Amino acid sequence: MASVSPLAKFKLVFLGDQSVGKTSIITRFMYDKFDTTYQPTIGIDFLSKTMYLEDRTVRLQLWDTAGQERFRSLIPSYIRDSSVAIVVYDVSNRQTFLNTSKWIEDVHRERGQSNVIIVLVGNKTDLVEKRQVSISEGEDKGKEYGVMFIETSAKENFNIKALFRKIAAALPGVDSYSLATKSDDMVDVNLKTTSNSSQGEQQGGAGGGGGCSC
């Protein structure tokens, strides 16, 4: 009988201040939904996704952390054994951007600077009129810390798939990032770029939006 290869597991921890949209990014990716009713994460939430790549199957473990100060003491233990750290800020709130330095430094302190993939994510690009952080500032900070950078809008579904393509391409041993999810595993996810989805993502960031966006 042929041996069964073990399922590769990668732990992704989402970090950032309260209300920057960490949960909304995960919800958009997992269920292709956006919840307009904001409910802050209490402590740590966990979701898991099995994905097929062209050469193997992997399981992504998504850990959603609370941004409130009173939960900060819980976070280092979740960073410690993570494969990927996604540090999220709100492009319409400059202080959340400034605070990403602390989050990135927390990751470096717990994991070192070479043993973890870090992605800096500027979320809520749909709030065009309220933007306080430019794309170039995000790019510069990414270069400063030697981390990947991308902007997203969970509300408009802008660059959400691109974010996870970026992550998938950087995972150890992953040469291809055409992904699909088991039909019985929550929701079907296909991260292969198509002309329609690319156009949708390109247009998503241009749409203005008022009110709360995560």
UniProtKB/Swiss-Prot annotation:
The modification Cysteine methyl ester is found at C214. Pfam families: Ras (PF00071). A lipid is attached at C212, C214 (S-geranylgeranyl cysteine). Residues 202-214 have a biased composition (Gly residues). GTP binds at residues 16-23, 64-68, 123-126, 153-154. The keyword Coiled coil does not apply. Signal peptide: none annotated. GO terms for biological process: protein transport; vesicle-mediated transport. A motif (Effector region) lies at residues 38-46. It is found in: Golgi apparatus membrane; Cytoplasm, Cytosol. InterPro entries: P-loop_NTPase, Rab, Small_GTP-bd, Small_GTPase. The keyword Coiled coil does not apply. Keywords: Cytoplasm, ER-Golgi transport, Golgi apparatus, GTP-binding, Lipoprotein, Membrane, Methylation, Nucleotide-binding, Prenylation, Protein transport, Transport. One of its GO terms (molecular function) is GTP binding. Coiled coil: none annotated. Residues 194-214 are annotated as: Disordered. Belongs to the small GTPase superfamily. Rab family. Protein transport. Regulator of membrane traffic from the Golgi apparatus towards the endoplasmic reticulum (ER). Interacts with the C-terminus of GC5, but not with GC3. NCBIfam families: small_GTP. This is Ras-related protein RABH1c. It comes from Arabidopsis thaliana (Mouse-ear cress).
